[in-house]
Each structure stands twice: as structure tokens, then as C-alpha cells.
């Protein structure tokens, strides 16, 4: 939701208890694997910049290039805080960065940017295709400036194809990729597949993988390369068998609600106390265990529903049996009985549930990080968990331009007088 301009009220009880430090990523002083790698993040919002966040968590130096007036729009997206230039979304997702303000629409700004490119390893951008070229920052120009440069370009539809110039956001990518078509109940309006911009995160994950592969190639050859990711195609890639099912059999998968066309019971069920559980029975053995948890082992007999094909043929009946059983018990009772019989089961957690869940806490899934001008903020911790080189969160989303002077003075060796002149002309 858009920022309100008001500082949200604090709730002391919302802070998760401290976890075992040995289970928390990055609590030591170990050398991080990407130390010495410099990343320029010149994108906005999440699609692409999130890849920079991942690299930063494992030691890369990330320079966030922003327009001097206002910076990344992500700063104003989400829940407002005491800092005018930082929502909670910005603090959480723009972690492990230094902010450098440069106006790329001015020629002197482009010249400064190219000096940074010459001293960097990776460049990440997510503008509409053609924008960088309009600024005089085409791939040939960048490659000539730094032949070892690795450039990740994330856009809604990729750098080629008839739709390349269209605006791209996660919501549109979910629709175009087929994900939104699958979300919702049969015959009803398709719904958002969750409220998070999944496509932006998924595209960034593929982008981060591409960068690591390109770094390996650079080690072997000394050459950089261009990485092109369309948000829609990143989402399409994770939709399992919908492409081969249509290609071979002309089958179009439709919306299935909380269930699955290949298994039953396999969905969300409401307990007597109004809470929800997820139950997944994808094999005959799992259903046999569920029948035992229900204290109705006869349901898993060959004559009734012991065979997957019979359960699928009687989907409504099997689901109704499960609905009635879960509805007769509290969620804790359902969980206990299923876990005793090793039935795959889990609660549908709200964030409040997660803050108090012993497993989240034992795994160190929360990091409490001090944010300048705000105080301590709880954010998701680093994954993946590496045994020898765990990542860490060093800082949350930085104030606008907090490292401009440092980077220009120390990295580019620009005089204090020249920096003052550039600032007066609003180039930085």
C-alpha cells in the first residue's frame, strides 16, 4: 500500500525472541565469498535489484545508483517510516548497499557512470529496453569501457521480441506467463497469486544465477557477457508441466482453488477454532496415514479410496470427509494427530504466527538490524545457508546519497571542489 506519511506505531511484543546465534547466518567475521566484487545497481524496485541484494549478502560491494531528486521509487513504496526516504519495503529489500546519486540524463552524469563501470565487475539494470541506449549506455559502449563487465538486464518481456518495449511489472508478468490464469477457484475470477511481486523475485534469482555463471566464465576467459531475463519467462519457467501437457495432449490446466488435479486430499482445510491447515496426500501411503489419523483406516482400503485413481474419481467425497474431520477438531489437534502418523501437514501461518514459531526462531529466520533514523527493524535473514561462508545483512536500505562523496572522492579520485561543483549543478 502507498505510504501514509505517518510513522507506524511500534509494538514491542512483535519483536521475535533472540535465536541461537549458531543458527543465524553471518554472525561471525568470516571472509565472504564475493568479497572484492563490485556491483553497480542502477535499477528501480525489485526486478534485478534483488539480485544485487543477494550478491551483497555474500560480500559483494553494491553501489546503488539513484537520481539525485527522489531516488529509487521503491523508497516510497510500502509502509511509511520515520524516515521520509525509506519505507519498510525499501529498508528490507535494498539491504547491503551504498547509495550514490548520479543524474544519468546529463552528459556529465553519464561520464561519471562510465568511470564507475570501468572499476566494477557487474552492472544490473531493469529499465525498459532502449532506455540505457538513449542515455548513451548501450552494451557495446559499456563493453568497450570494461571488457570484463557482466551486465544483467531484467525487463518485463526481455530485450528482444515484439513486446520488448512494453512496460513490465510483476503483476503483468504473472498474467502473461500463465500464473494468474491458474490462481483462484474453478469458473471464478482469477486472483493475484499472493500479494508479493513473485515475478520480480524469481527473475532476480535467475539473474543472480546467471551472474555467478558469468563470473565463472570470466575467471576462465577474462571476458564479461550480457545476461537477458524477461520477468514473464522467469515465472513461466517454474510452471512445471503445463507446456508439455498442452504440446502433447492439448490439455489446458484450469484453476483448481486450493487443491490439485493430481492428488486428493491436497488443499486447505478449516478447523473447529476457525484456523486453517494444509494437508497434502500425494501418494497412497500418505492417504493411508491420514486415514489412520482420522481413526478410519477402512477409508484406505482397496475397495474404497486406497488407490489414487479411485480418490481422484471420488474427489468431492474424499474432500468432504477431510473437511468434516478437520472441522471437528481444533487446529492444534489436527496438527498433533497428523504429525503422529507422519501425514504432511502445516498451519497456514500469518506473520504473527511466524514471529512466535519455534522453528522460525531456531533457524534464525529473522534478523534484527539497526536502521539509521528509525531503530531496530526485523527483516528476513539470509538464505541460502552456507556452512563455511554464510552471508550476512550489514545494513538496511541506505539514506539517499549516503555514499556519493565517499565513492566519488575515494574510488574515482575526484576532488572535493569538483564534487561540490557537480552537486551545485545537480549532476549528483
UniProtKB/Swiss-Prot annotation:
InterPro entries: CoA-transferase_III, CoA-Trfase_fam_III, CoA-Trfase_III_dom3_sf, CoA-Trfase_III_dom_1_sf. Induction: Under autotrophic growth conditions. One of its GO terms (molecular function) is succinate-citramalate CoA-transferase activity. Optimum temperature is 55 degrees Celsius. The keyword ATP-binding does not apply. Optimum pH is 6.5. Signal peptide: none annotated. GO terms for biological process: carbon fixation by 3-hydroxypropionate cycle. Keywords: Carbon dioxide fixation, Transferase. Residues 1-31 are annotated as: Disordered. Its EC number is 2.8.3.22. Residues 21-31 have a biased composition (Polar residues). The keyword Transferase applies. Forms a large complex composed of six heterodimers (alpha, beta). Involved in the 3-hydroxypropionate cycle used for autotrophic carbon dioxide fixation. Catalyzes the transfer of CoA moiety from succinyl-CoA to L-malate to yield L-malyl-CoA. It is highly specific for succinyl-CoA as the CoA donor, however it can accept L-citramalate instead of L-malate as the CoA acceptor. Belongs to the CoA-transferase III family. This is Succinyl-CoA--L-malate CoA-transferase alpha subunit. It comes from Chloroflexus aurantiacus. The lineage of its organism: Bacteria, Bacillati, Chloroflexota, Chloroflexia, Chloroflexales.
